[in-house]
């Protein structure tokens, strides 16, 4: 099987890095939180008049967002006007719409075989293979009236000025050949262009047997994964580490799994499952900044997963129920988060490794027939999902090889985010003749934790947190806290 899957994302391009206003209404400098954050950052030694100024700016920003539509909408007329004015002098446009592409080519192969023995046990086996090449690139979608777009790294241009124009080139080879930065038009690739290459192969086997009320299934898999980045452009900031192939990351993986079931009678049965897996890291987490260079994530390792669960099944004419307990541990995960860090005035990459998690809990499900095709159904899930270690991290600038900092993310024993750890479902369902079906359900979810910003969980971040006695000394501290909550 082969496939070609193009994906893209349109985005307005024109960041505020060279003194021109950012056109996005939700740009962080236009929001009330920008001014309240400044109050907190400058809390020590700030004059009371400055506190009042920032407070007034925050209130004005909030009022404008609520009452002035021009503050919450894109001003395309102004963007076209500014681009047209640039055309008169032959200069590059300053606003345009980009289209970020993810074009995937995927080839898959699978073969399997099975043999049934005289005792009706079954042995199955097979192999799978995959070749994937995904191209990531940026493309000019709409110039918004401009004649062309200059393909340079504006952040590098801001940081390095004009003393070394080589550093700001997104396509250094073009600059060295023609003596000027590349001019791109609508439909042209720009900014970044690279291939993510993946090769995978697995061999697996599974044995199934049944003896009286006991059944079991034992399985295993051994696999190999290789991945590498292939840059299509030589970036000026990383002239020796952006064009061409990166080193190949190789991983030997395996999986072991056992499923066991014993049926005491038609009404009572227990199931048990155990699995241990070693998985390769994801490509997106294997490189510090795949858009710009071949540098791999420090401390990158295979992910280890151990899972066990035990269930009791009840099946009677007047009730069907299942009670399950489970435990899962995950070790050595990696993750890369890219974001604009206003404390560094730069787009940064926050690469983490050694992320460990633990999940355990209890699940109960029940169905009770009531009358004439109407039945009651309910389900309850109670879990406890936490981080079990302090992950390692390295933070780098997107436009520099310099490591800004490296330490631990202090989230040991904190809750895993984004999934409910308490869930309840209650409902009534009706099954009528001719497959007619209707249901009414009530769902309740609790203990859903927001995703944590790991940059706020470092030793350096904790060192800047005010103690209660320090916060009490701030002029109007309660007032500004209330403002932040608004």
Task: State the predicted function of each range.
Residues 119, 327-329, 348-455:
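Gram-negative outer-membrane beta-barrel transporters
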Residues 1, 123-127, 216-220, 256, ...:
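Transmembrane beta-strands of outer-membrane beta-barrel proteins
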Residues 1-132, 320-322:
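Outer-membrane beta-barrel domain signature, strongest for Gram-negative TonB-dependent receptors
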Residues 1-6, 92-136, 186-215, 249, ...:
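Outer-membrane beta-barrel transmembrane strands
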Residues 2, 129-135, 211-213, 222-228, ...:
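Transmembrane beta-strands of outer-membrane beta-barrel pores
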Residues 93-96, 100, 122-265, 392:
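Signature of Gram-negative outer-membrane beta-barrel scaffolds
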Residues 171-183, 226-237, 248, 262-308, ...:
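Surface-exposed extracellular loop regions of Gram-negative outer-membrane beta-barrel proteins
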Residues 3-18, 140-150, 155, 232-243, ...:
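Flexible, surface-exposed loop regions and adjacent strand-edge segments
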């Amino acid at each position: 099987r082969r496939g070609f899957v193009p994906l893209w994302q349109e985005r307005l391009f024109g960041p505020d890095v060279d003194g021109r206003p950012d056109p996005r209404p939700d740009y962080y400098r236009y929001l009330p939180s920008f001014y309240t954050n400044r109050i907190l950052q400058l809390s020590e030694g700030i004059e009371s008049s400055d506190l009042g100024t920032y407070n007034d700016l925050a209130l004005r920003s909030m009022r404008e967002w609520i009452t002035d539509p021009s503050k919450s909408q894109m001003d395309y007329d102004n963007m076209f006007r500014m681009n047209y004015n640039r055309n008169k002098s032959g200069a590059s446009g300053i606003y345009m719409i980009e289209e970020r592409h993810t074009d995937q080519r995927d080839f898959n192969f699978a073969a399997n075989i099975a043999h049934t023995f005289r005792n009706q046990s079954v042995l199955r086996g097979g192999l799978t293979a995959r070749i994937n090449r995904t191209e990531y690139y940026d493309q000019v979608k709409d110039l918004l009236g401009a004649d062309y777009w200059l393909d340079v790294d504006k952040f590098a241009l801001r940081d390095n000025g004009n003393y070394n124009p080589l550093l700001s080139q997104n396509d250094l080879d073009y600059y060295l050949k023609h003596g000027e930065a590349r001019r791109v038009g609508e439909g042209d690739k720009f900014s970044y262009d690279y291939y993510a290459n993946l090769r995978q192969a697995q061999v697996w086997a599974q044995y199934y047997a049944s003896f009286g009320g006991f059944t079991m299934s034992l399985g295993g898999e051994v696999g190999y994964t290789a991945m590498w980045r292939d840059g299509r452009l030589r970036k000026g900031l990383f002239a020796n580490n952006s064009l061409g192939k990166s080193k190949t990351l190789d991983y030997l993986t395996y999986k072991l799994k056992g499923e066991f079931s014993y049926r005491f009678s038609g009404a009572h049965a227990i199931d048990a499952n155990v699995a241990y897996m070693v998985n390769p890291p994801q490509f997106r987490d294997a490189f510090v900044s795949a858009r710009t260079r071949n540098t791999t994530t420090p401390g990158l390792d295979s992910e280890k997963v151990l899972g066990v669960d035990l269930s009791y099944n009840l099946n009677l004419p007047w009730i069907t129920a299942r009670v399950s307990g489970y435990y899962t541990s995950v070790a050595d995960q990696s993750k890369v988060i890219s974001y604009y860090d206003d404390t560094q005035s730069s787009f940064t990459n926050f690469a983490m490794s050694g992320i460990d998690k633990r999940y355990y809990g209890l699940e109960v499900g029940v169905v009770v027939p009531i009358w004439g095709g109407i039945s009651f159904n309910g389900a309850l899930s109670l879990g406890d999902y936490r981080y079990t270690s302090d992950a390692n991290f390295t933070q780098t600038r997107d436009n520099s090889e310099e490591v800004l900092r490296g330490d631990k993310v202090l989230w040991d024993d904190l809750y895993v985010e984004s999934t409910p750890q308490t869930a309840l479902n209650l409902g009534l369902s009706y099954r009528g003749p001719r497959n007619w079906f209707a249901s009414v359900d009530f769902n309740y979810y609790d203990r859903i934790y927001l995703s944590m910003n790991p940059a706020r969980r470092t030793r350096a971040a904790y060192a800047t947190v005010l103690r209660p006695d320090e916060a009490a000394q701030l002029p109007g501290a309660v007032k500004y806290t209330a403002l932040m909550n608004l």
